[in-house]
Amino acid sequence: MRKVLVVVLVLLCLASIYIFIPNQIMVSEVEEVESSERIIAKYLNSNENRQKWWPSSKQILDSTGLQSSVLDYEGYKFDFRNSNYNFNEVLIINNSLKINSIITWDLSTKNLIRIRWKVSIPTSYNPVTRVFQYLRAHRLKSHMALIMESFLGFIVNSKNVYGFHFEREIVQDTILATSNTISTSYPKTLEVYNRINSIKKYLREQGANQVNPAMLNISKSEQGAFQLIIAVPINRIIPPVQGILINRMVPGNIVVAQIKGGPHSVAKGFNQMNLYLKDFKLVSPAMPFQSLITDRVDEPDTSKWITKIYYPIF
């Protein structure tokens, strides 16, 4: 009777192995992230860029000494190959395991990208081997999840992608005393601060207070003239005067970044902010501007300047 019971239990165990472990084990990771297809492709399809977010610090070089398409993680090798704009084939190697996986990505909603990483692992008819293959598939899924987490954690940080930390905020300064002048040459720092000081003088006369650093926008027309717009945030409405207007801002959304450095650094920040707006399909209803945190007259060393840059969005 005991022998019969043992045989029955063994048969049940074997049957359960074949019932619960399929002939093809599907391993997949599916995530959604607020990003763009351009960013996903840039950091998945480039050997150099993959090194920036890969969770293991170990690098594999090819025969020429360049960064290889093969990356190592916990004893598994991942060989990225046959990539295009929204598709990447990854060969996964671990001892006897050598199998292709597929990473795809597409637009889920306006700024939400769905990323899928899938692999199908065939199993053996040998029950012991089948169990080991199931355990290895479970371990592989865990590794894929951690790799995906590392990738997503990297690309959602704007500092990693654009070189600057961008924040979306609500406009706080809604009352501005503004000045608009045109010149044939690029406005010098002293000219800018002369205009700022003229506005401040008028504020004192009217008993109004400046509540934040002065704002600046310089643009060049097709004819080559430079338009200098200065805006000083103030605490209340005051009468306009010749050369100084009082404008009301809608408390809408705005993208903000803090820049350290001179005009070149600020221009680079605006270029990257433009790319950020394009990636996330954001539209600007108004001109961008700088907030002069550092007094540029008192601090002639441009490398020490701190400037906040802003882009209104909706």
Tell me what each language-model feature is.
Residues M1-K3, Q24:
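Absolute protein N-terminus
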Residues V4-F20:
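Hydrophobic membrane-insertion alpha-helices, especially the h-region
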Residues S16-I21, E37, A41-E48, P55-L66, ...:
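A solvent-exposed interaction/effector surface
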Residues Q24-I39:
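Alpha-helical transmembrane signal-anchor/signal-peptide segments
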Residues V30-E34, D79, T104-D106:
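Generic structural detector for well-ordered beta-strands
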Residues I60-S63, K77-N82:
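A structural signal for short, hydrophobic beta-strand segments that form beta-sheets
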Residues E74-Y76, F87-I92, K98-I103:
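N-terminal post-signal-peptidase region of extra-cytosolic proteins
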Residues S83-E89, N111:
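Ser/Thr- and Asn-enriched, surface-exposed coil loops between beta-strands
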